[in-house]
């Protein structure tokens, strides 16, 4: 988890991905996605503050969102294409955003995953 | 705004940044940040569904979050370090996430900005 130089004042790690060929049934299942994001919060070792979900468009697409004390986790879905995007962004050495990301991916059952890492740390200058 | 090959089925653009040396007064001003994120939603040409804000820790740090029909916008702040992170992730050719990101940055008055682009599009395979 590289990036920057010097000591980190704030440790922030953001794992995000674009998921192709997911199970469309799960992508339109609001309560399943809420359960998944809550479980992911625990796996990340983050403290859940709030979960919200919103359905958009005529095809059952969903946004499911968790605000955690350590930042946020989101899932956006396009069931009509089997496509979803996932963000797990948590702060603090005590958190494990990669494990939470991998858990969400395992539940959405994609055929292909494009995963990326964003360093959201603050470095001492 | 590169990435992938072939036609885009879903257009998703995610601009995110780490902001150093921001005005600490603004970073702990919940109502100011809510006003800023609402205005950013308009500038992005996105449709606002919900705004939430959460204060965390003893130093007045805030998370301000906007769910839009086209994905999400977030601001996380650490006033004690003058540090903030900003994400503007919107879907659709009609949106302008870069303009919204630049607007938020202008309001937080950082001395240094690390900005990144994440392609969240789905490409035809």
From Swiss-Prot, chains A, B:
Cofactors required: pyruvate
* Cofactor: how and how many bound: Binds 1 pyruvoyl group covalently per subunit.
PTM info: Is synthesized initially as an inactive proenzyme. Formation of the active enzyme involves a self-maturation process in which the active site pyruvoyl group is generated from an internal serine residue via an autocatalytic post-translational modification. Two non-identical subunits are generated from the proenzyme in this reaction, and the pyruvate is formed at the N-terminus of the alpha chain, which is derived from the carboxyl end of the proenzyme.
Could you name the active-site residues?
Answer: 71 (schiff-base intermediate with substrate), 76 (proton acceptor), 91 (proton donor)
Q: Which of UniProt's keywords are assigned here?
A: Autocatalytic cleavage, Decarboxylase, Lyase, Polyamine biosynthesis, Pyruvate, S-adenosyl-L-methionine, Schiff base, Spermidine biosynthesis, Zymogen
- A GO term from the CC aspect: cytosol
The EC designation for this entry is 4.1.1.50
- List GO BP terms, alphabetically: spermidine biosynthetic process
Keyword Magnesium tagged:
no
Quickly give the catalysed reaction.
S-adenosyl-L-methionine + H(+) = S-adenosyl 3-(methylsulfanyl)propylamine + CO2
A molecular function (GO) term: adenosylmethionine decarboxylase activity
Which InterPro entries does its entry note? AdoMetDC_C, AdoMetDC_fam_prok, AdoMetDC_N, S-AdoMet_deCO2ase_core, S-AdoMet_deCOase_pro-enz
Broadest EC class? lyase
Question: Family assignment?
Answer: Belongs to the prokaryotic AdoMetDC family. Type 1 subfamily.
State how it assembles. Answer: Heterotetramer of two alpha and two beta chains arranged as a dimer of alpha/beta heterodimers.
**Function in brief:** Catalyzes the decarboxylation of S-adenosylmethionine to S-adenosylmethioninamine (dcAdoMet), the propylamine donor required for the synthesis of the polyamines spermine and spermidine from the diamine putrescine.
Q: What is this protein called?
A: S-adenosylmethionine decarboxylase proenzyme
Species assigned in the record: Pyrobaculum islandicum (strain DSM 4184 / JCM 9189 / GEO3)
């Amino acid at each position: 988890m590289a990036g920057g130089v010097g000591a980190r004042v704030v440790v922030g790690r953001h794992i995000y991905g674009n998921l192709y060929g997911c199970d469309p049934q799960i992508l339109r299942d609001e309560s399943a996605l809420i359960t998944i994001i809550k479980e992911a919060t625990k796996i990340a070792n983050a403290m859940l503050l709030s979960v919200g979900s919103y359905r958009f468009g005529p095809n059952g697409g969903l946004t499911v969102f968790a605000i955690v004390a350590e930042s946020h986790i989101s899932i956006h879905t396009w069931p009509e294409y089997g496509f979803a995007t996932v963000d797990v962004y948590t702060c603090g050495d005590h958190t494990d955003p990669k494990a939470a990301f991998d858990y969400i991916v395992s539940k959405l059952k994609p055929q292909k995953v494009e995963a990326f890492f964003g360093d959201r740390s603050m470095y001492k200058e």
